[in-house]
From Swiss-Prot:
The keyword Phosphoprotein applies. The modification N6-(pyridoxal phosphate)lysine is found at K246. The modification Phosphoserine is found at S734. Residues 619-781 form the MOSC domain. The active site is at C413. Its cofactor is pyridoxal 5'-phosphate. The gene is mal. One of its GO terms (biological process) is molybdopterin cofactor metabolic process. Its EC number is 2.8.1.9. PROSITE patterns: MOSC. This is Molybdenum cofactor sulfurase. The keyword Phosphoprotein applies. Belongs to the class-V pyridoxal-phosphate-dependent aminotransferase family. MOCOS subfamily. Keywords: Molybdenum cofactor biosynthesis, Phosphoprotein, Pyridoxal phosphate, Transferase.
Length: 781
């Protein structure tokens, strides 16, 4: 592990710290510089003094304002090591507005295509809606980094080119900090693309004519230029989009589009003009003339001149606080500083392990932190529990905020990068955003235990090694030294200190009742209650649970150990009927009312777990239906009619084997890592109550709990047999379920816990019927 080496001298660091004293006063650690960096205190003081000293007004009124704006244009070009001979500077509201300007005005000709990188900011995806291209394609990063379609070392020249294709990508991914090699720019401009990417739309439908176009590059540099030098003499993209608040912290509301001379040639005549962009426009005729100067044609209306003037102090502040040296420029030094911090954080995170050796975090990057030319000052990760389950990024945001740490969570307006780094296929994205209902910017962080986003920390020139040590200490103390319930209690106790959105997230930290499964007929399939459904409880458990059973000709209970096809009988509880279904076309109904059935039924006795059980025979018709579908003679359907108590503590039981309820934790099931769908594995365990704590096998430590205010006592773990080897949807056996549990539990066959409802303490003659509802909060006591 490489030790951290500071880029700045002690004197330089002291000067920087003095400019950001508000962080210490507010006890804040700021780690979201990819969102925006922070302004220096003397920077805004100097900007205000400049406004107080000068009369700065509309540039059409005052020449001084125009001179200031021209100074800023010159300074921007100098900052990127270029001149007005090579690039125009168009002021925009931000990088997004710059991208929109390119999309609206780029001339694709008759055959040009729009290509964009998957790992791009949402604003680049928005360009798809405005470009007038022949086709729209999504490129993988490697299809850009691989360079152009070079043939035999010569430029691929084709006569008669009819179109202009635009390739848009980020110089630095704002999700991971990965930097696409900038030498790809010239290669693509000269040789085109070796592969067009995935076609999303074409004016020709599925058919694509293989035409040869000129290629232009639009570089989204917003994330990159905040902490890295961009040399436009060395790399010459046709369009560069950026926001200045990313670089200076202040002012906001001003960005720029830099357009090369080559890029200007394919900017078409605009469909709109605003004030300041024309020489004249007649009201009585469709006649107008645009300005001669290129940038003036695209700067509609009055510029945000006060913000633009404020940029001068931004440039001066960087040069003052991070002076260039004989070896490195200001931005090169900032790049070295943030990269050094990111490398240190990544090294430290890799060392963090749970007591069982499992890593605390999962990191998301492509090439590691070996070369600042390929990786910037961003670290993206998710936290894992000791069992390997993911901790939701919303919880991390809460814990960090309560420790005074500001960081970013989610997908960071870059769903494509989220998809790539989290390994989400197209169906998974549909599941997260369309079916589960996640939206950009929310704290809906886990879907079926899998993360929908990540935690991101990013650094600026004012970030210190002490800042990152506080981050690391927060992770150690909160996720290596405490249990999940301790964290939840800590967050709940401090919740009033959180911002509104995170307060809402606190309500989601406690596990909830996800699903209830009623098994009306012992050993047959489940009747499931999903959110927001509710279900009544009786003295014996969930109403109608294991109230019927199938017996053979000897009166012995039939189970899946003898007849796996029982799982194919699907009970459906209706208003007054229990309908039994087998396959798509065979079904039979019996009455739900015990009184209705008792009048016509013969009494009989069977056994469950060696205990006698009184029951009512449900008749010959259903018996024949069962025998025909299961292929066994002499079957009967019995319904429990008498009270049955457990031998241990006289709790009232239905036809269950051991306790009123069996509780299962989906996180524990997820730890098995079977290839089959998770829901199918959950079904194997035939539990009544399904929760998800986010931490595997946490339930084995419970002594008591409440669900929606209903109290339960834990009877102990469920000792498993080979019944769980049966796939409850097909009836097929597979032994790996049992062997995996044995391995995870070190030879013990425990999975799920038995629980019993504690009767409510009431003196009412007719106590109120209790219901459980999917979504009820689970509180462990």
């Amino acid at each position: 592990m490489t030790p951290y080496r500071p880029e700045f001298s002690a004197a330089e660091q002291s000067r920087i710290d003095a400019e950001f004293s508000r962080l210490a006063r507010n006890k804040t650690v700021y780690l979201d510089h990819a969102g925006t960096t922070l302004y220096a205190e003397n920077q805004v003081t100097a900007a205000a003094e400049q406004l107080q000293r000068n009369v700065i007004c509309n540039p059409h009124t005052c020449r001084l304002t125009g001179d200031f704006v021209d100074q800023v244009r010159f300074k921007i070009l100098e900052f990127f090591n270029t001149t007005a001979e090579d690039y125009h500077v168009i002021f925009t509201a931000n990088a997004t507005a710059a991208l929109s300007l390119v999309a609206e005005n780029f001339d694709f000709g008759s055959s040009g295509d729009f290509h964009f990188c998957q790992e791009n900011h949402t604003s680049v995806l928005g360009m798809r809606e405005r470009v007038r291209a022949n086709g729209i394609y999504m490129l993988r990063e490697k299809e850009i980094s691989g360079g152009g379609a070079k043939e035999n070392g010569t430029v691929h020249q084709v006569s008669g080119k009819t179109g202009n294709s635009l390739v848009t990508f980020s110089a630095q991914c704002n999700f991971s900090g990965y930097k696409i090699p900038l030498d790809s720019i010239e290669k693509i401009q000269n040789y085109g693309l070796s592969k067009p990417g995935k076609q999303l739309w074409s004016a020709l439908g599925d058919k694509k004519e293989h035409t040869h176009n000129d290629y232009y590059i639009c570089l989204d540099a917003a994330s990159f230029v905040a902490t890295s030098p961009l040399d436009l003499r060395k790399y010459r993209p046709d369009y560069v989009c950026l926001s200045f608040y990313k670089i200076f912290g202040y002012p906001t509301g001003v960005g720029a589009l830099l357009v090369s001379r080559r890029g200007a040639e394919v900017f078409q005549k605009r469909r709109f003009f605003g004030g300041g962009t024309i020489n004249y426009a007649f009201p009585h005729a469709m006649d107008y003339q645009l300005r001669e100067t290129f940038h003036q044609r695209y700067e509609d209306g009055t510029l945000p001149f006060l913000s633009i003037v404020g940029l001068l102090e931004g440039f001066r502040t960087l040069e003052r606080l991070v002076p260039k040296t004989d070896e490195f420029s200001t931005m090169e030094r900032i790049s070295r500083h943030v990269f050094g911090l990111a490398k240190y954080v990544e090294d430290q995170l890799r060392q963090l392990q749970h007591p069982n050796g499992e890593p605390l975090v999962e990191l998301y990057n492509k090439v590691g932190y070996q070369d600042k030319a390929r990786q910037g000052g961003i670290v993206a990760f998710n936290v894992r529990t000791e069992s390997g389950s993911f901790v939701g990024f919303g919880e991390i945001a809460c814990v960090a905020a309560l420790h005074g740490i500001l960081l970013r969570t989610g997908c960071f307006c870059n769903i494509g990068a989220c998809q790539y780094y989290l390994g989400l296929d197209e169906d998974a994205l549909d599941s997260i955003y369309k079916r589960a209902g996640r939206i950009c910017g929310d704290y809906f962080d886990l879907v079926d235990g899998q993360p929908t986003g990540a935690v991101r920390v990013s650094f600026g020139y004012m970030t210190t090694i002490q800042d990152v040590e506080q981050l690391l200490q927060m992770l150690r103390s909160s996720y290596l030294a405490t249990k999940p319930l301790q964290r939840i209690q800590f967050i709940e106790e401090q919740a009033e200190q959180l911002p509104p959105l995170l307060k809402e997230r606190v309500q989601l930290l406690r596990p909830k009742l996800l699903q209830m499964a009623i098994y009306p007929v012992k050993s047959c399939a489940a009747f499931k209650i999903e959110s927001p459904g509710s279900w009544p409880l009786t003295d014996q458990g969930l109403k109608y649970d294991r109230e019927w059973m199938i017996v053979d000709m000897n009166g012995m209970a039939l189970t899946q150990k003898r007849c796996t096809e029982l799982c194919l009988i699907r009970p459906v509880i209706k208003v007054d009927q229990l309908e039994l279904q087998f396959g798509d076309n065979s079904h039979f109904s019996v009455p739900l009312s015990l009184e209705d059935q008792a009048a016509d039924s013969a009494k009989c006795v069977s056994k469950v777990c060696r205990q006698p059980v009184e029951g009512l025979d449900c008749g010959d018709a259903v018996a024949q239906w069962l025998s025909e579908n299961l292929g066994l003679e002499g079957l009967r359907l019995l319904r429990q009619s008498g009270q049955r108590n457990s031998s241990k503590d006289q709790q009232k039981l239905s036809l269950v084997n051991q306790a009123q309820f069996l509780l299962l934790n989906r996180s524990s099931v997820r730890s098995l890592q079977f290839e089959e769908p998770l829901d199918e594995t959950v079904d194997r365990f035939r539990a009544n109550i399904i929760i998800d704590t986010g931490s595997a096998f946490e339930e084995l430590t419970y002594k008591a709990l409440s669900i929606g205010g209903i109290q339960f006592q834990v009877e102990g773990p469920c000792q498993r047999c080979d019944m769980i080897c049966i796939n409850q949807r097909t009836g097929e056996r597979s032994p790996e379920t049992l062997t995996t549990i044995s391995r995870l539990q070190k030879g013990r066959m425990r999975f799920g816990i038995y629980i019993t409802r504690i009767p409510p303490d009431t003196k009412d003659l007719e106590p109120k019927e209790q219901h459980m509802t999917c979504g009820d909060v689970v509180i462990v006591e």
